[in-house]
Amino acid sequence: MEEWDLLNENRELTRKTHIRGEKLAPGELHLVVHVCIFNEKGQLLIQKRQKDKEGWPNYWDLSAAGSALKGETSRQAAEREVKEELGMTIDLSNTRAKFSYHFEAGFDDYWFITKDVELSDLTLQTEEVADVRFVTKEKLEALRSSGEFIPYFFLNQLFELKNATTIHF
């Protein structure tokens, strides 16, 4: 049983929790994290979701993602999801989420790191992850165009956001 903290519109804890799989009531918000892992060549690590995964089965997705569990910060959730899904330990203590997207059911924090990773060193969570690979910006766009990648509206900007230190060009 996965339990999430519920937040208000200001991202403050409400002292209420939610059980994954139950319907969120209007105004109940929770925290989700996505991690984008780039290698030194500037390629993005992506994962293919299992064909029986709830939500976007058999689609390619960002490096790792999931909901924050009760008591977790965004950073802790991001580190845990990478460990669970890819078997890789990362340390985000000296970084911040690159951006946060507010969606109907909560907040989605996006973490970006650059780390050279050997695919053969990863231990995939077989219940969730079917495959992994590194892709260029062009290959990512081809996967999105062919309907194989989850259609995040900001995919074209991911590679620019990776190195951005300001919101201006």
Curated annotation (Swiss-Prot):
<comment type="similarity">
    <text>Belongs to the Nudix hydrolase family.</text>
</comment>
<keyword id="KW-0460">Magnesium</keyword>
<feature type="binding site">
    <location>
        <position position="81"/>
    </location>
    <ligand>
        <name>Mg(2+)</name>
    </ligand>
</feature>
<dbReference type="InterPro" id="IPR015797">
    <property type="entry name" value="NUDIX_hydrolase-like_dom_sf"/>
</dbReference>
<feature type="domain" description="Nudix hydrolase">
    <location>
        <begin position="28"/>
        <end position="157"/>
    </location>
</feature>
<keyword id="KW-0378">Hydrolase</keyword>
<dbReference type="GO" id="GO:0046872">
    <property type="term" value="F:metal ion binding"/>
</dbReference>
<dbReference type="GO" id="GO:0016787">
    <property type="term" value="F:hydrolase activity"/>
</dbReference>
<protein>
    <recommendedName>
        <fullName>Uncharacterized Nudix hydrolase lin0387</fullName>
        <ecNumber>3.6.-.-</ecNumber>
    </recommendedName>
</protein>
<keyword id="KW-0479">Metal-binding</keyword>
<dbReference type="InterPro" id="IPR020084">
    <property type="entry name" value="NUDIX_hydrolase_CS"/>
</dbReference>
<feature type="short sequence motif" description="Nudix box">
    <location>
        <begin position="65"/>
        <end position="87"/>
    </location>
</feature>
<dbReference type="InterPro" id="IPR000086">
    <property type="entry name" value="NUDIX_hydrolase_dom"/>
</dbReference>
<dbReference type="Pfam" id="PF00293">
    <property type="entry name" value="NUDIX"/>
</dbReference>
<feature type="binding site">
    <location>
        <position position="85"/>
    </location>
    <ligand>
        <name>Mg(2+)</name>
    </ligand>
</feature>
